[in-house]
């Protein structure tokens, strides 16, 4: 075989080998990105569902340092109350209210903020307090032309919703708190931290699959996907949900922990509905009973059986029904 033929053979071999290598590399990179594509697709699907429920996203610049993102009802109906839904630590609002936005959008004009450092909401300011979160929510609502509303908050969102009622009594007509540790005593907080055995920031802002599994086990009472989900999926979930503004999210938790616990919460004037899962391992039902006693006679406590901390995810039908009857009903319903 002459040298020209040998060279053509070698060239063809190298070209074929390179093509196969590139194809294999492409397949591997695509396979590697499947978890990311999965969660991006889910996020897109959730946004489309919110739009299907008659909501649209909007972003409001509160000042040159703070931006807040909302989902709001497209067409306000004056025969419907306004309901502000405040999410907790489990990611942006679309992920947390997916089981509620459909039924509630048929009864209320909805305003759903992403709290600062979640979703597209952000602030360059150093304030990490629940008071600051509440003030930003109200400034955003006023920018949307909303002056009076009922507030509903879950977990961390319950802290913010309570501040809304405390700071803006003329704006907040009714209040719904779901599984939130407002008013827990120093003894209760110490007992819970000892039971959990980990710093709350390590759990509520997980950094690895084991942290996320612990968070799910604490939040849910009923069987869930936590046992079978592979590590690579959980890592991507953490990347999507928690790595954005990770430092700021941790600072929000640290602010709550640095505050001196006070079982005597500020008394508010609004009618208040407390909804609790009887199996809550984060904020036990005894906390709800203490809050109820302090807010009587203007509070009502509803305990949902066989439900954990994530009542909005585990028992959404019960939560939705209670919210609709309370907010739509008479002041003493």
Name these PLM-found stretches.
Residues 1-83, 106-108, 328-333:
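Alpha/beta-hydrolase fold catalytic core
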Residues 72-120:
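Conserved HGGG/HGGXW glycine-rich cap/lid loop of the alpha/beta-hydrolase fold
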Residues 131-149:
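Conserved acidic catalytic loop of the alpha/beta-hydrolase fold
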Residues 162, 166-167, 171-207:
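Flexible "cap/lid" loop of the alpha/beta hydrolase fold
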Residues 20, 36-37, 186-194, 203-267:
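Conserved alpha/beta-hydrolase catalytic His-Asp/Glu region
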Residues 2-8, 297-333:
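Catalytic active-site module of serine/aspartate enzymes centered on a nucleophile-bearing elbow/loop
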Residues 270, 284-292:
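Short alpha-helix in the alpha/beta-hydrolase fold that links the catalytic acid
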Residues 268, 274-276, 280:
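Short beta-strand/loop motif that positions the catalytic acidic residue
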């Amino acid at each position: 075989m002459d040298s020209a033929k040998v060279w053509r053979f070698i060239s063809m071999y190298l070209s074929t080998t390179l093509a196969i290598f590139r194809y294999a590399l492409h397949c591997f990179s695509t396979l590697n990105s499947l978890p990311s594509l999965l969660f991006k697709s889910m996020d897109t699907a959730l946004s489309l569902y919110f739009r299907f429920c008659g909501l649209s996203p909007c972003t409001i610049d509160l000042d040159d340092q703070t931006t807040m993102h909302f989902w709001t009802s497209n067409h306000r109906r004056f025969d419907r109350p306004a309901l502000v839904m405040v999410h907790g630590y489990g990611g942006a609002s679309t992920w947390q209210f997916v089981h509620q936005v459909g039924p509630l959008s048929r009864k209320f004009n909805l305003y759903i903020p992403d709290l600062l450092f979640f979703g597209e909401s952000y602030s360059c300011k150093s304030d990490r307090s629940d008071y600051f979160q509440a003030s930003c929510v109200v400034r955003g609502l006023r920018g949307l032309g909303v002056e009076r509303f009922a507030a509903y908050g879950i977990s961390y969102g319950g802290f913010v919703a309570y501040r809304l009622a405390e700071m803006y009594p003329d704006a907040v007509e009714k209040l719904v708190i779901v599984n939130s540790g407002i008013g827990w005593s120093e003894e209760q907080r110490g007992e819970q931290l000892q039971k959990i055995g980990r710093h709350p920031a390590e759990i509520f802002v997980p950094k690895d699959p084991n942290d996320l599994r612990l968070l799910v086990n604490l939040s849910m009472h009923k069987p869930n996907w936590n046992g079978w989900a592979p590590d690579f999926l959980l890592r991507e979930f953490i990347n999507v949900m928690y790595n954005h503004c990770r430092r700021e999210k941790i600072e929000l938790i640290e602010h709550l922990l640095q505050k001196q616990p006070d079982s005597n919460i500020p008394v508010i004037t609004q009618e208040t509905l407390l909804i609790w899962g009887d199996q809550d391992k984060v904020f036990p039902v005894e906390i709800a009973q203490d809050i109820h006693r302090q807010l009587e006679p203007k509070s009502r406590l509803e305990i949902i059986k066989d439900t954990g901390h994530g009542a909005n995810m585990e028992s959404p039908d019960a939560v939705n029904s209670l919210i609709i009857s309370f907010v739509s009903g008479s002041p003493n319903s």
